[in-house]
Amino acid sequence: AVFGCGDHNWASTYQYVPRFIDEQLAEKGATRFSARGEGDVSGDFEGQLDEWKKSMWADAIKAFGLELNENADKERSTLSLQFVRGLGESPLARSYEASHASIAENRELQSADSDRSTRHIEIALPPDVEYQEGDHLGVLPKNSQTNVSRILHRFGLKGTDQVTLSASGRSAGHLPLGRPVSLHDLLSYSVEVQEAATRAQIRELAAFTVCPPHRRELEELSAEGVYQEQILKKRISMLDLLEKYEACDMPFERFLELLRPLKPRYYSISSSPRVNPRLASITVGVVRGPAWSGHGEYRGVASNDLAERQAGDDVVMFIRTPESRFQLPEDPETPIIMVGPGTGVAPFRGFLQAREVLKREGKTLGEAHLYFGCRNDRDFIYRDELEQFEKDGIVTVHTAFSRKEGMPKTYVQHVMADQADTLISILDRGGRLYVCGDGSKMAPDVEAALQKAYQSVHGTGEQEAQNWLRHLQGTGMYTKDVWAGI
C-alpha cells in the first residue's frame, strides 16, 4: 500500500514519485492490498491521510488478519522540559545542509505609490556555496516577534527563560535537544506557529479543555466540512484557538511537540553567477493582507522576515537545483521564450544577465522573448533593467498590463496569442520555452494559448496540439518553475 505525501505548490511534479513507486511495485510482482492514497501538505493533509488509513486498515485486516487498537485522545507528552541557563540554536540548518550568509542589499522594487511591496535582496554567499541560473535559494526564516510574544503570554513564560529539551518515543529532530536554548529562540527558529491547525491538534486541544461547552465546540471543529470551512479556509492556527479557549490547560511542552517543524521557503534566484559568483539575489513578494479569519492582518512568515532584514544581517540559506532542467540552453544561439508575470520574472533576470555576459564575450545569441505581466506601471519591477537589456539586443520584452487605466485587461497569454506565428516558429526551430509563476491559473492559461496558437498556425486539431505540448515537455524543450498557493 502506498500513500503519497506531496505539495500541490509544486504542480509539475505533484505525486509523481508515489505514482511511479506504486506502478513499479505492481509491475515487479507485488500485490496491492489497498488503493494508493494522496496527501497534500498545503491542503487538508490530515483529513486525506485519515480517510486513506481507514480504508487501508480495513483492507489490511482482510489481507493479514490484523486487529486495530484505538489510541486515547489525550496522549501523554513524550517531551520533558527543564528550565536552565545558557543558549542554544535550532538544528534545522544541519538537516538542510544550510549555511550562514549575510544580506548585502535589500531594496524596494515597487514604485512609491504602489500598494504592494516586492523586495530585491542580494545575499553574499559563503566561499563554498555555488549556484547556476535557474536554481532555487532556500531560506530558513524566523517567526515574527508578534507571534512569539503571543505564545509566551498565553503560557505565562518569558522569552529569556532557558530550557533544555529531551524527547523519547517520537521524532523531535527539528528541536534543539539536550542543550540550553532560550524560549525566544526556540519559538523563533524551530516550529511553524501560524499554520492552520490540524485535526489532531484540535482533538488534543479539546482533550485538555476542562470547560464542557468549549470542549464540545473544539470537537465539532474537527468534523468533516466544518474543519475545511472554519479552520483550513480561514487559516485558524492552534495558537488562535488557544487564545480563544482559555479553559484549555494544554502544557507548553505538549503544545511545542504538536507544532510542525519550521519549513524552508524557496525563491527562484534572480541573478547570474557569471556576473558575480559570490552574490545571489532573490525577488520576494511581501505577503500582507486582511486575515482570512476576518480578524487582523495576515503576514507571510518568510517574506516579512526577509523584508525587514538589513545589510549585514545574517540569513540561513541553501541552494537547490530544480529537477525540471530550468536552465539556459548549452548553445547560446538556441532561441528562447520566457513567460514570467510578477515575481515570476526572477529567474529570467538571471538568464538575461548571463546572456549579456555571453554577448560581451563575443558569443552569438539566439533571439529571446520575455513575456512579463503586472497590474500597471507602478508594479513594473526591474523596468529600467529590462528596458536596458532590450536596448542592448539581449531580449525583446512584451508587457501585459491587467489593470492599467484606459486599457483593456490584458494578461501574458493574450499577448502571446497575438504573436502566435512568432512563437510557433521559434518552437518549430528547436527553441526553448520557460514558464515561471502561478501554476494554478497563469500556467494553464499560457498552455491553452500555446495549443490554440499551434492549431491556428498548423491547421491541426485539439488532440494534435496537446500531443505537441506534451512532446515539448517530455524532451525538455518546455520547462516550468511554478507554484500554486492555496
Feature annotation, model-predicted:
Residues A1-I486:
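FNR-like FAD-binding dehydrogenase module
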